Amino acid sequence: MAAWAERLSGVRGVLLDISGVLYDSGTGGGAAIAGSVEAVARLKRSPLKVRFCTNESQKSRRELVGVLQRLGFDISEGEVTAPAPATCQILKERGLRPHLLIHEGVRSEFDDIDMSNPNCVVIADAGEGFSYQNMNRAFQVLMELENPVLISLGKGRYYKETSGLMLDVGGYMKALEYACGIEAEVVGKPSPEFFRSALQAIGVEAHQAIMIGDDIVGDVGGAQQCGMRALQVRTGKFRPGDEHHPEVRADGYVDNLAEAVDLLLQHMDK
């Protein structure tokens, strides 16, 4: 008990991962993880600031929020920090015109972006779109550029759907890095800029915030690198070996979001 009180003291803001923490995606909209709907509601009734922080790149924010609302979650589009809008801002600021290797579900986020005569490649979780033809075209675009720029929406290895584990964008990103001899710019977790933008949105300093996620590297490690605390839930992509990871150790491990919220609210003012 004393250990938890020390780990959670002074927390004013909570960043929540979505996939694997709130719900598992999949056919029919996926399924809420037991206890997570009420856990989010309890957090939002508390004095704690809450921000949803996701690497979701198969759905637009609007579509993702719609799925979650239908599952019963209290969430709005403006409460979500996601990589596609952040990427669009970067593209505009730097005058980049992307060749897109992304899922059709997120393409609407790029409607205002100039894609003529591409001078970079943007890759996301394209799902079935990761064909040889599409990967090779992205490779060709990069190789034709004097200074190739590859932007990746996250770099996750895999995630969990209701039907099982699914390959994420990271493996495909690494293939293009290797083939082209370049290093991708990652927008999304574990990028420090991504976490900082989420914290800025709720007006909380890193040392006052805690991340709750299922990814030991992207969620936990990334948050800790920014000076935040982080809890790992034993849902979603969690594997038992995560608790013995050679490089990253969470500030605590909990069975699910409901347990994390119980602990946070119990020790909120201690």
From Swiss-Prot:
**What is catalysed by this protein?**
diphosphate + H2O = 2 phosphate + H(+)
**Might you give the EC number(s) for this enzyme?**
3.1.3.-, 3.6.1.1
The residues that the entry says bind substrate are: D17, I18, S19, T54, N55, K189
Q: How is the cofactor bound?
A: Binds 1 Mg(2+) ion per subunit.
The cofactors it requires, by name, are: Mg(2+)
List the Gene Ontology MF annotations in alphabetical order: inorganic diphosphate phosphatase activity; metal ion binding; phosphatase activity; protein homodimerization activity
Q: A Pfam family this protein belongs to? A: Hydrolase_like
Places the protein is found: Cytoplasm; Nucleus
Its GO CC terms are: cytoplasm; cytosol; nucleus
Which UniProt keywords are present, listed alphabetically? Cytoplasm, Hydrolase, Magnesium, Metal-binding, Nucleus
Q: What does the entry list as the binding residues for Mg(2+)?
A: D17, S19, D214
* GO biological process, any: phosphate-containing compound metabolic process
Q: Which domain of life is it from?
A: Eukaryota
- Please describe the quaternary structure of this protein: Homodimer.
Q: What does this chain do?
A: Phosphatase that hydrolyzes imidodiphosphate, 3-phosphohistidine and 6-phospholysine. Has broad substrate specificity and can also hydrolyze inorganic diphosphate, but with lower efficiency.
Q: Which family does it belong to?
A: Belongs to the HAD-like hydrolase superfamily.
Per its record, how is this protein called by name? Phospholysine phosphohistidine inorganic pyrophosphate phosphatase
- In which organism is this protein found? Rattus norvegicus
Which gene is annotated as encoding this protein in its UniProt record?
Lhpp
